[in-house]
């Protein structure tokens, strides 16, 4: 829908999407990773608070949404899809922090960001984007004044913590 298109077209490095249920955040997350993976070869993640949650929300839908001719192969154990252009999209869980280390990412969607530990972003995921100058999108529903709210403020012009690399 039109709000998702605005998000897809945005060129900010970091985007915080705070939206209510049924906005289409999960669909946006999958499509955003796919569009970027088709445009620029690399590794893209969708990270949920838990591996199980990522599998339930994204894995089966992602397999259906990517046209067969774009898929090189799928790895059901690792929840990864290798595209014919060499890109890879993986579903991850922040509950297994060790599985998030030691790689370089082109882009990541942090899903249900308010339910994740800020340390996972700051100490584990963010460093994976440094070499490629990769992007990150944080999505979730509003859940009070927490680290996700703080990220949201970074993208709001006029806030004390505004950062021009961010959009909310």
Language model features: what each stretch is:
Residues 1-168:
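Phosphate/NTP-binding elements of NTP-utilizing enzymes
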């Amino acid at each position: 829908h039109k709000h998702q298109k605005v998000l897809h077209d945005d060129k900010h490095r970091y985007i915080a999407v705070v939206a209510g249920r049924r906005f289409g955040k999960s669909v946006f997350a999958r499509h955003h990773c796919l569009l970027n993976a088709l445009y620029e070869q690399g590794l893209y993640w969708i990270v949920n608070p838990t591996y199980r949650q990522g599998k339930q929300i994204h894995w089966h839908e992602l397999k259906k949404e990517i046209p067969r001719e774009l898929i090189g192969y799928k790895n059901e154990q690792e929840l990864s899809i290798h595209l014919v252009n060499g890109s890879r999209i993986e579903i991850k869980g922040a509950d297994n922090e060790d599985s998030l280390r030691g790689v370089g990412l082109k882009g990541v969607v942090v899903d249900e960001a308010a339910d994740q530990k800020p340390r996972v972003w700051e100490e584990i995921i963010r460093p994976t984007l440094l070499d490629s100058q990769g992007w990150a999108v944080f999505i979730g529903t509003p859940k009070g004044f927490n680290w996700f709210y703080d990220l949201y403020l970074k993208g709001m012009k006029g806030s004390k913590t505004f950062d021009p690399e961010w959009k909310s």
